[in-house]
């Protein structure tokens, strides 16, 4: 069985070629101002299992990473908006999620450390002077939209940092080019599968350089389209799709000597915040869904109906704490750079999360 960990010497030997390849790719792509990815290390596969264009956990980053995060934020803003002095953060409308409030607080701190004035707010939060976070209140600023122009206390900021995933659709006041990430990246338009479609050719290229089968560096996945689980015919077809997918995984596992039962994640292709996700080891489990679980799978954030499902290989994590709790690395990227790593630990979950 191939263990990715055994490739350390090969990676070191190809260091210069890999660094040059990455530099070339960055020059060809307009990298986002920020994003985050969840990674699973199974030993025989190390792969990104989820990606977020509007990361909401900056409060989890290490204090020692703040200088580098600040440096990368400043570099990105200077490159795209060289005359910027004022950055406005356009947040989600979570008023009770204290963890998210702390994310905003840290994000604002990074912007201010980069040398910019920073304000926070959106029109839906105009009834609030502040949001209550874990470490106290976070002040908000009055926001209104006039003729599709976003104004903060009557003035237009130089740059809008979007920290709202736009599940319910595009919003007024965000049509200006001074908004990053682009609103078109919102969940109302973006799909989870697009991340893997974009990632796959890159993985294939780097795998050829390293000398490894790309299967060891990416999740297997496909999209089962136009499915409404309220209709029995759709559920039967989706279950059949899952069974075919799992059978192919089982064949690959057997060929590689991987002694475990394949697992598939069934995900709302537009889903977020962990909604519209379940794990299965057979299509029959979908046919046996209770009404409650079926509705949970069908709806994403904002109660949006689900028709397309991403069927994704479940990659277990071999990383764990001394007490045996599973550990999942999370990478926060700023300006195309892996700027901060932290680890998600949940003793209530198994190695599949």
Task: Please describe what each predicted stretch is.
Residues 87, 160-161, 179:
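Receiver (REC) domain switch-region micro-motif
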Residues 115-154:
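A short, well-structured beta->alpha microelement
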Residues 54, 164-167, 268-271:
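Short glycine-rich anion-binding loops that position phosphate/pyrophosphate groups of nucleotides
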């Amino acid at each position: 069985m191939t263990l990715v960990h055994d490739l350390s010497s090969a990676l070191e030997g190809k260091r210069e070629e890999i660094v040059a390849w990455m530099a070339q790719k960055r020059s060809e792509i307009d990298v986002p101002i920020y994003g985050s990815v969840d990674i699973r290390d199974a030993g025989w596969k190390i792969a990104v299992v989820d990606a977020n264009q509007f990361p909401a956990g900056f409060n989890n980053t290490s204090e020692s990473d703040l200088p580098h995060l600040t440096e990368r934020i400043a570099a990105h803003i200077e490159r795209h908006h060289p005359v910027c002095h004022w950055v406005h953060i356009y947040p989600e409308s979570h008023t009770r999620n204290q963890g998210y409030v702390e994310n905003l607080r840290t994000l604002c701190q990074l912007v201010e450390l980069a040398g910019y004035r920073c304000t926070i707010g959106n029109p839906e939060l105009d009834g609030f002077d502040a949001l209550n976070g874990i470490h106290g209140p976070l002040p908000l600023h009055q926001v209104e939209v006039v003729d599709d122009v976003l104004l903060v206390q009557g003035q237009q900021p130089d740059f809008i940092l979007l920290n709202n995933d736009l599940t319910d659709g595009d919003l007024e006041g965000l049509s200006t080019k001074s908004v990053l990430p682009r609103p078109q990246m919102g969940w109302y338009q973006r799909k989870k599968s697009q991340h893997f479609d974009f990632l796959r050719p890159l993985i294939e290229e780097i795998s050829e350089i390293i000398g490894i089968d790309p299967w060891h560096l990416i999740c297997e996945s496909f999209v089962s389209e136009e499915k409404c689980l309220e209709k029995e015919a759709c559920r039967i077809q989706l279950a059949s799709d899952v069974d075919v997918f799992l059978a192919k995984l089982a064949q690959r596992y057997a060929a590689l000597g991987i002694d475990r039962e394949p697992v598939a994640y069934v995900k709302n292709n537009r889903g977020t915040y962990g909604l519209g996700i379940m794990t299965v080891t057979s299509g029959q489990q979908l046919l046996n869904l209770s009404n409650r679980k079926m509705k949970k799978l069908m709806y994403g954030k904002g109660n949006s109906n689900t028709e397309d499902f991403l069927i994704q290989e479940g990659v277990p994590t071999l990383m764990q704490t001394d007490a045996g709790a599973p550990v999942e690395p999370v990478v926060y990227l700023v300006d195309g750079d892996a700027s901060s790593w932290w680890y998600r630990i949940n003793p209530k979950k198994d190695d599949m999360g």
